[in-house]
Amino acid sequence: MRTKIAIPMGDPAGVGPEIVVKTAVSKEILDLCDLVVIGDKKVLEKATKICQVDLKIHTIKNIEEGKYEKGILNVIDLENVDMNTLEYGQVQGMCGKAAFEYIKKCVELAMEYKVDAIATTPINKESLRAGNVNYIGHTEILGDLSNSRDPLTMFEVDNMRVFFLTRHMSLRKACDAITKERVLEYIERCTKALKQLGVTGKMAVAGLNPHSGEHGLFGNEEVKEITPAIEEAQKLGYDVVGPIGADSVFHQALQGRYVAVLSLYHDQGHIATKTYDFERTIAITLDMPFLRTSVDHGTAFDIAGKGIVSAISMIEAVKLAAKYAPNFKNIK
């Protein structure tokens, strides 16, 4: 049986519908897995015209009704977009509410094991708020709906997998958050997350300061917090090394020396992956009962409705979901 990937259509006023229909006609995807989109049929039909793709939108009530063949996109139509009021590139409460409902349905399917993974399209924080959806993004929504305490984000591009010790906080606060306890906790969590994907091997922890502090010469975080955490993790049996200078560790990961890198703050990991290949850097959410991959770009309101958006990131997100889904384990 072929892997089935659920895709929530995303914000109807953004580029989500366009990247969905472009992905659905990609030969790479047709050869790899089956897609089920949760969205609005009329929006997707309009997207096929905008993007000039030859694709029939086939409405289904459940996964079993799907026609998984070339030229057909199976859609669970929630019928929650008024085409008379839809405006591309605009913040609309209707669209934020609809985007949330698509995600919610995807989670239901994943929790019921009807699909093997979820690959998400962009949503807009302002639209969510306008639609009275009190979440700031996908990760928080997915965590809440799946009763997952703190989902873990990993970026992947080619041989490089990157986790984040801290994410959405100021750099000053991120430095203060680098404690022995937190580093040790994340080594444990990242190792568990890799096991969910069926990945084992040596993980590296990036350094914070230039040359990892040069034994305290350029900062003492490595000496006081990071190194003691790594040494404790090694005693507990974790296959981890570091801290390794951030100017070297990501290159070494690309060479295959490490299966993953724990970066210490948001931009440290983002710059490494996105400079290497912006479009093919994919976010994976782990430490949940199901696998989720995502494009790493926004709703692109400035080009929505024009048919010019690239679907490379969406195609890569689906490919990565299909790669890991067969071996994915819900490790508690």
Swiss-Prot record:
Q: What's the record's note on cofactor binding?
A: Binds 1 divalent metal cation per subunit.
Q: Enumerate the Gene3D superfamilies for this protein.
A: Isopropylmalate Dehydrogenase
Keyword check for tRNA-binding, yes or no. no
> Disulfide connectivity?
none
Q: Name one GO molecular function term.
A: oxidoreductase activity
**What's its EC?**
1.1.1.408
Q: Provide the residue positions that the database annotates as binding substrate.
A: 138-139, 274, 292
What catalytic reaction does the record list? 4-O-phospho-D-threonate + NAD(+) = dihydroxyacetone phosphate + CO2 + NADH
Keyword Transferase among record annotations: no
Q: Where does a divalent metal cation bind?
A: 168, 211, 266
What this chain does, per the entry, is described as: Catalyzes the NAD-dependent oxidation and subsequent decarboxylation of D-threonate 4-phosphate to produce dihydroxyacetone phosphate (DHAP).
Q: Which NCBIfam families match?
A: pdxA (TIGR00557), PRK03743.1 (NF002992)
Q: What name does the UniProt record give this protein?
A: Putative D-threonate 4-phosphate dehydrogenase
